[in-house]
Curated annotation (Swiss-Prot):
The keyword Nucleotide-binding does not apply. It catalyses: pseudouridine(1915) in 23S rRNA + S-adenosyl-L-methionine = N(3)-methylpseudouridine(1915) in 23S rRNA + S-adenosyl-L-homocysteine + H(+). The keyword GTP-binding does not apply. GO terms for cellular component: cytoplasm. Keywords: Cytoplasm, Methyltransferase, rRNA processing, S-adenosyl-L-methionine, Transferase. This is Ribosomal RNA large subunit methyltransferase H. Its main location: cytoplasm. It comes from Mycoplasmopsis synoviae (strain 53) (Mycoplasma synoviae). One of its GO terms (molecular function) is rRNA (pseudouridine-N3-)-methyltransferase activity. Belongs to the RNA methyltransferase RlmH family. Specifically methylates the pseudouridine at position 1915 (m3Psi1915) in 23S rRNA.
Amino acid sequence: MTINLIAVGKLEKDFQKLFDEYAKRIFVFSKFNLIEIKENTLKNLEVKKEKETLEILSKIPKNSTVFLLSIKGKNYSSEEFSKLITNDANITFVIGGSNGVIESYFENKISFSKLTFPHQLFRVILIEQIYRAFTIKNNLKYHK
């Protein structure tokens, strides 16, 4: 199994430390790849969003089930999320840039909340939930 995360931008040092800790834990269950897309500096937000979206699409591995993280996506419980992501051989999660992505390119959308989260923090939340999903599937004590 391989989990891929494609995200626009780089993490700051403190968030990176937390992210790396969960990435290390995930390697027990699955390969994990992080693909960071450089944030585009164009002033025109629609052009910026389009360029970032096309860059993301070009990085998605073949035969991968893709989930865009979006406020418009479907909500899952931790148990449902575990079933969703641990039954596929190759999964890619996408976190767009600060101006979003062109969502029509993405069939599957997941929402963790109707709230808006800072991108730095959300990347850590996502990887923690991926780790939690594996602990649920493997009946480990982490999830209560």
